[in-house]
């Protein structure tokens, strides 16, 4: 009522409201009401500035223009670059800028994290939190890590560059195919990498034996009797592929990228699908006493968890 009463008042149009932690002592529904009310006020001539520690106070619509204020012993209080400005710095063409903003803005948690872990697919996003907590006894929130799903790997390099421009440490988890289809283009592997070449020869052997279709020496889904993801898993299981894949894994790890050495996360966890029922059942299994014995690659998962923790340590 007050807004409607004064909306034409020139003095009110320059009113600045400064609010510290408007979400304090409120239940989630009330926090949402406050957020909406402040948003409405900002559209009615008020200038609203609020400080918050709650991801609920910042929607994906506002992530890219939010200011990130941090404090540490080395730098004192400082402001990180806005996501919108970082994207413009890294991505030059406007359509790609919009795509990148949409991809990263979908996770408002990264605004409150000291460290971001990018994932390629939804499986990692759905099962890694429970898996990580079961293996380490710590949650992602406890190590101040935001798990951000990309929905694909084509933007991995640019996403990492944007977050680096925002002064946010970042690591990424990708499927094995990334090393063969994108890592060279992104500059993480040399074009003539000997380990990639060796594994490419193994693809040719599989294509001859299994009548698979390759395009530019790589497995594809179209017009092939075996899905590309399955072919990568088949190649990764070959004894002669173990050393070159391990080499590829180590090269990418040094650059902040974890590649699944068995093809994809499903092979390491023994998952037989990519749907909510499979993910939910796995998260329930995480709570069982004999869970560790059921993992096909416990050692690899334990190493991954330590790698994630090491990434959080690099932020201090």
Predicted regions and their residues:
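Acidic, Mg2+-coordinating catalytic modules of nucleic-acid enzymes
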Residues: 100, 104-118, 122-316
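Switch/communication elements of ASCE P-loop NTPase nucleotide-binding domains
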Residues: 1-106, 310
């Amino acid at each position: 009522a007050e807004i409607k009463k004064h909306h034409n008042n020139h003095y009110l149009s320059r009113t600045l409201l400064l609010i510290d932690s408007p979400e304090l002592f409120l239940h989630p529904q009330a926090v949402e009401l406050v957020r909406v009310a402040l948003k409405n006020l900002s559209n009615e001539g008020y200038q609203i500035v609020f400080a918050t520690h709650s991801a609920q106070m910042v929607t994906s619509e506002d992530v890219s223009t939010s200011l990130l204020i941090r404090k540490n012993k080395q730098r004192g209080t400082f402001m990180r670059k806005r996501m919108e400005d970082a994207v413009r710095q890294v991505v030059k063409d406007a359509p790609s800028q919009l795509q990148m903003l949409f991809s990263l803005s979908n996770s408002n948690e990264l605004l409150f994290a000291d460290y971001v872990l990018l994932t390629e697919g939804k499986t990692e996003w759905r099962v890694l939190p429970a898996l990580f907590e079961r293996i380490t006894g710590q949650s992602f929130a406890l190590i101040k890590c935001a798990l951000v799903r990309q929905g694909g790997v084509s933007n991995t390099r640019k996403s990492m560059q944007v977050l680096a421009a925002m002064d946010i440490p970042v690591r990424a988890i990708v499927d094995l195919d990334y090393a063969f289809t994108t890592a060279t283009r992104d500059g993480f592997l040399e074009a003539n990498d000997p380990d990639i070449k060796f594994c490419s020869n193994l693809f040719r052997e599989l294509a001859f034996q299994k009548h698979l279709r390759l395009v530019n020496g790589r497995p594809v889904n179209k017009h092939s009797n075996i899905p590309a993801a399955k072919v990568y898993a088949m190649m990764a299981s070959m004894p002669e592929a173990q050393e070159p894949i391990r080499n590829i894994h180590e090269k990418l790890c040094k650059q902040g990228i974890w590649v699944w050495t068995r093809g994809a996360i499903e092979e390491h966890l023994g998952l037989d699908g990519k749907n909510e029922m499979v993910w939910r059942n796995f998260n329930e299994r995480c709570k069982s006493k004999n869970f560790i014995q059921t993992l096909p690659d416990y050692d690899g998962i334990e190493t991954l968890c330590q790698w994630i923790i090491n990434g959080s340590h690099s932020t201090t």
